[in-house]
């Protein structure tokens, strides 16, 4: 009985915090985008071995934040590092671990996303997680990759409520299969185009004639611009976009976006950087403008089993995709990134947070009508 009462209280509180609407991705509403097909889950976890975990922190009237962990493979990541690259679309952000990734071309930990003032907790959590793994008793240096967006309008960000243990929990809870989207994990308190943002994900599987590779993307959306969905000027029609306060009084929306791209195509860090650049093109397709105050970062990784980097090896031999075979992966990255960004909006709920501030969800019914009328 006690457990049942607690569940009822929790649901009641969440009902006051979140404004519910039916949750479907853009594709589930009947609007597939792009020319390539998604994987089974239309998620980053369609890439074999990739897992995602969330810790969502909603407490009282003002705590609206969390942690999202992306685990690139199920082995010892520190010993079997993944080829990686990071591309900075606009550098107004606090992404940790950038310089070593750029110098060495690999990532040796799970990738963690959280809020701006919890990056330090994220680093500590990732480091502690890595040090406690079997065989790491002599490890004295860990390059934790921790990204962020600023959820300080809805969340009491100054309270620094995220703890290192929450980061460890998110990593340990990471799983394959369907990925929770919307107001979860690092996307709990984010805003996007003036609406409630969050976590979004999507994937593309290339035909066998193009290699059969999978590209998966996960995003944390907290950015602005003039929302465009599959070519439809949604933000303009809804009169909700950046710079509209030059026409009528409205709040200017700014912010950041973290994009994580994973593929099983055998790529080195150089071509992964080229892939990461294409994710920014996907962001542009949504109407994002990489504004002055936006931290827009892309983390790209390859988890092709034969190309993992053995930290104990003195020489490394790998087979990588030729430059001439990259174009289809570029296109798949653009498609999956754009759809992941849109999904973060479609899957989010309106939320009330710090100081009674409220952010509405994307008005899905109106948007669907616009998309249907376009046809």
Feature map (PLM): residue ranges:
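Hydrophobic h-region of N-terminal signal peptides that target proteins for export
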Residues: 11-19
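Alpha/propeptide regions of enzymes that mature by internal proteolysis
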Residues: 21-375
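Sec-dependent signal peptide recognition
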Residues: 3-8
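Intrinsically disordered, low-complexity sequence elements enriched in Ser/Thr/Gly/Pro
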Residues: 1-2, 25
